[in-house]
């Protein structure tokens, strides 16, 4: 279980670079003051309120941002699922990728993780080629896990596939830096 947690938290770090929305100056200030939950509590709550209002008004980048910040920055994983799901269904690839991580590692919802990676694989552009490749590989692996569920536990299969794909890409990233 320790290796799975390491892989999960390592992916959280990588995923922190994928959110594409342009925040306002106020949002940037609040984000910095919040400091991933280690700073001013009032800044965290105000930022979540602003982004939640954007999400509620149909701004899918706002949904993606509030889902990401709540889940990956502040550890409010269950609360982050609804805005991530909403923005994923609207085609925000980063949200689909992040939702897939939660569904595999935390919730065991392999069917939704598969659907999320189908969207992420289709929607990531060449600008985010590494995330596109990972998403497409995860889509294929999860499809296999779901089809072959008579012989194995789909959740264990998905977590193993996720760990393998993460490790493969992480090793490739390190070897290209040397």
Model feature map: region roles:
Residues 130-178:
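Terminal, low-structured helical/coil segments at or just beyond the last alpha-helical repeat
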Residues 37-40, 58-60, 73, 90-93, ...:
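Short helix-capping/linker turns of helical repeat alpha-solenoids
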Residues 111-126, 159-166:
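TPR/TPR-like (Sel1-like) alpha-helical repeat modules
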Residues 18-49:
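N-terminal leader/linker segments that initiate helical-solenoid repeat arrays
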Residues 41-46, 72-83, 108-116:
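Structural signature of tandem alpha-helical TPR/SEL1-like repeats
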């Amino acid at each position: 279980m320790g290796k799975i947690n390491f892989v999960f938290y390592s992916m959280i770090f990588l995923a922190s670079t994928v959110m594409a929305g342009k925040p306002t100056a106020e949002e940037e200030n609040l984000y910095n003051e919040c400091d991933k939950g280690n700073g001013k509590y009032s800044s965290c709550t105000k930022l979540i309120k602003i982004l939640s209002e954007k999400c509620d008004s149909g701004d899918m980048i706002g949904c993606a941002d509030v889902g990401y910040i709540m889940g990956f920055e502040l550890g409010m994983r269950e609360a982050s699922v609804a805005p991530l799901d909403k923005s994923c269904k609207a085609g925000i690839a980063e949200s689909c990728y992040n939702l897939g991580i939660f569904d595999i590692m935390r919730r065991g919802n392999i069917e939704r993780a598969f659907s999320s990676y189908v969207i992420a694989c289709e929607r990531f552009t060449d600008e985010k080629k590494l995330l596109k490749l990972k998403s497409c590989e995860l889509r294929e692996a999860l499809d296999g896990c779901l089809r072959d569920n008579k012989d194995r536990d789909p959740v264990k299969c998905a977590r193993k596939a996720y760990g393998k794909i993460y490790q493969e890409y992480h090793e490739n990233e390190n070897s290209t830096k040397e």
